[in-house]
Amino acid sequence: MAKKITGYIKLQVPAGKANPSPPIGPALGQRGVNIMEFCKAFNAKSQGMEPGTPLPTIITVYADRSFSFESKMPPVSYLLKKAINLKSGSKEPGKAVAGKIKRSQIVEIANTKMPDLNANDVEAATRIIEGSARAMGLEVVEG
């Protein structure tokens, strides 16, 4: 018989840097999950990623206080900023341009993010990423 699920916890955890301090500790402690066990398992699973990369993680908590977790790809905003070495997006998107990004870089990000996106093909995923880039105040250029 399947375990009874008592809840889900959504967190953005830096790859390889999960520790019991806030926000991870209190969120897991409220549900009675063994915090150190999660931290060790998460750090082991995210070992291949670049340290510090934020990973959206969904933790499923079961009635017997055990857990399972699933990590997704980093957020699009993080990938866009990393692609053009930007600290933050534009303060006034649509008016002020924070930077320029090539369409080839956007296609690369779309391929990386494809499993998490609600798109049927890379072309649709590329349009989603382009929209995110424009919303951050980035100008999409050919290339």
UniProtKB/Swiss-Prot annotation:
Q: Ribonucleoprotein: is it a keyword of this entry?
A: yes
Task: Give the record's keywords alphabetically.
Answer: Methylation, Ribonucleoprotein, Ribosomal protein, RNA-binding, rRNA-binding
Q: Which SMART domains match?
A: RL11
**Domain of life, per the record?**
Bacteria
Q: CDD domains this protein is in?
A: Ribosomal_L11
**What does the UniProt PTM comment say about this protein?**
One or more lysine residues are methylated.
Q: Name one GO molecular function term.
A: structural constituent of ribosome
Name its GO BP terms in alphabetical order: translation
Please give the GO cellular component terms listed in this UniProt entry.
Answer: cytosolic large ribosomal subunit
Its biological purpose is as follows: Forms part of the ribosomal stalk which helps the ribosome interact with GTP-bound translation factors.
**Protein family membership:** Belongs to the universal ribosomal protein uL11 family.
Subunit structure of this entry?
Answer: Part of the ribosomal stalk of the 50S ribosomal subunit. Interacts with L10 and the large rRNA to form the base of the stalk. L10 forms an elongated spine to which L12 dimers bind in a sequential fashion forming a multimeric L10(L12)X complex.
Question: Which protein, by its recorded name, is this?
Answer: Large ribosomal subunit protein uL11
Organism per entry: Zymomonas mobilis subsp. mobilis (strain ATCC 31821 / ZM4 / CP4)
List the lineage, top down.
Answer: Bacteria, Pseudomonadati, Pseudomonadota, Alphaproteobacteria, Sphingomonadales
